[in-house]
Structure formats: structure tokens, C-alpha cells
């Protein structure tokens, strides 16, 4: 487990010296371009029980996000609101131990599924962890969610990526049911199942729907993306370009890309 000094919002535990350098660069680009870091809410309650012993520091992930994102959404836009809500949800699921303290979701009604797989209620989703939820529809030889612990699932990907930022690409409908496309990316500098990365950029593209209540809390989330190819890239069985062939071959049309991803994602 990471101690409070090295509790990061990324996969790489950082020394104080490393964190100081990252923060210095982060502040520099914020001043230079007038950019703001993502807003992850609900992190300041002194009674929060943090999973790793302390409040996470997202400086590394935020730095990578600002430098490598493909979209800059205007302040107050629906895209930015959705982006920050999802980032808050990810933070709470990854770092707040008790599901009852997660304020980005409605604790009584929240449910989530990925690629047409099992629908998880709030408490169970928190117990098994985001990765087991989002990879649940994969065959067991790709990802065995039934026999992978919360800790094991997070270690697998945090050992592969120093940071893995996420961004909203486009939003196609407003509340209460928000439909959106997204991008998740990172440089494979670590190791996954004994396969060493070479620093290659690994990108995930997908789409999702999120239902929110009048408090802008998530009540239902459905996510679709090509999970199997992602794992095969980390195993060295495919190249990163293979994972994005459908998305990029459609000439940038999100609906054609989504249809191509959906045809692979849903079980037959």
C-alpha cells in the first residue's frame, strides 16, 4: 500500500522530489496558457476514510491531461461538467474506502455496467473496484473478474501506467440522460503480465450514457469500448494502432466508430 506522501491519482508512487518537479511544471503551464486543473469535488471532508491512508495527489495525472488532451472544453460547458463529474466519481471509487462517502453518485439508486455485462449496484461496484466492473464482460482468459481482487485489479494497471488520463470528447444529449464519447490514454512504461512496455501511447476510445438526478449525482452509467483489444495490447499480442483502427478508419464520425466498437463489445 502507498503511504500518504506517495498517494497519487496515478499508478506511480512518487517521491517528494518527483512530486515537486511535477507540480512546478504543472504550475508553469497553467500560468503560461491560463489553463485550469480538473475539478475533482468532495475531497476536503476531514472525516473521509482514504483507502491508501491519505488524500490523493493528482498532479501527475493532471499534468499529462493538460499536455496531451485532444479537446479543451469552455468553462461552464456541459462537456466540462460531465468530464469533472466522471473524474470525481473515479477519484471516489479509487480512493474513498466507504461507498457511503461517495457524493458523485446517488447511493440508493446507482448502478453501472460495461459492454452489456453485469449490472452492479453501488455497494458491490465499490467492493470489486472499477476495473473489475469495466472489464466484467470480458472472457475469463482476457480478464477474470470473478477471481481478481480490488487490490489485484488496480495493481495490474497501476504497474503498467504512470498515469492514465481521461477526457470527454463530445456530448450529444443533456441531463437527465447524458450521452457522450470519451478517450482514455497513457504511455505504457511499466509491466503487464510480464510484458514490458516501451513507452508506447495506448489509447482507448468509447462511448457511454450517464443518468443524473437533480443534484447532478450519477444514478445509472453504461460504458462501451473495446476492452479485449486493450488487454491484448498490454500483453504484446496487438499493437496500439490495432485498438483504434475502427475509431480512426471512420473519418472521425463518432457514431460510426461507436457502432464498430459496439459490434465487438456486446456478447453474441
Task: Put a short name on every predicted segment.
Residues 1-268:
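C-terminal and inter-domain tail/linker signature
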Amino acid at each position: 500500500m502507498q503511504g500518504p506522501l506517495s498517494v497519487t491519482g496515478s499508478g506511480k508512487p512518487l517521491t517528494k522530489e518527483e512530486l515537486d518537479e511535477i507540480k512546478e511544471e504543472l504550475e508553469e503551464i497553467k500560468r503560461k496558457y491560463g489553463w485550469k486543473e480538473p475539478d475533482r469535488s468532495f475531497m476536503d471532508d476531514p472525516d473521509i476514510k482514504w483507502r491508501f491512508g491519505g488524500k490523493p495527489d493528482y498532479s501527475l495525472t493532471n499534468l499529462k491531461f493538460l499536455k496531451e488532451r485532444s479537446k479543451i472544453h469552455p468553462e461552464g460547458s456541459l462537456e466540462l461538467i460531465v468530464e469533472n463529474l466522471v473524474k470525481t466519481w473515479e477519484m471516489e471509487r479509487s480512493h474513498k474506502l466507504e461507498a457511503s462517502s461517495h457524493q458523485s453518485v446517488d447511493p440508493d439508486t446507482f448502478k453501472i455496467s460495461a459492454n452489456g455485462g453485469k449490472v452492479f449496484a453501488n455497494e458491490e461496484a465499490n467492493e470489486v473496484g472499477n476495473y473489475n466492473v469495466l472489464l466484467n464482460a470480458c472472457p475469463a482468459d482476457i480478464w477474470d473478474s470473478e477471481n481478481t481482487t480490488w487490490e489485484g485489479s488496480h495493481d495490474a494497471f497501476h504497474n503498467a501506467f504512470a498515469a492514465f488520463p481521461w477526457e470527454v470528447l463530445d456530448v450529444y444529449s443533456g441531463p437527465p440522460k447524458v450521452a457522450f464519447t470519451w478517450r482514455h490514454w497513457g504511455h505504457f512504461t511499466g509491466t503487464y503480465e510480464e510484458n514490458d512496455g516501451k513507452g508506447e501511447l495506448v489509447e482507448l476510445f468509447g462511448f457511454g450514457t450517464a443518468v443524473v438526478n437533480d443534484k447532478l449525482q450519477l444514478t445509472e452509467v453504461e460504458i462501451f469500448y473495446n476492452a479485449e483489444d486493450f488487454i491484448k495490447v498490454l500483453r504484446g499480442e496487438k499493437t496500439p494502432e490495432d485498438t483504434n483502427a475502427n475509431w480512426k478508419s471512420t473519418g472521425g464520425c463518432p457514431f460510426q466508430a461507436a457502432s464498430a466498437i459496439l459490434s465487438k463489445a456486446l456478447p453474441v
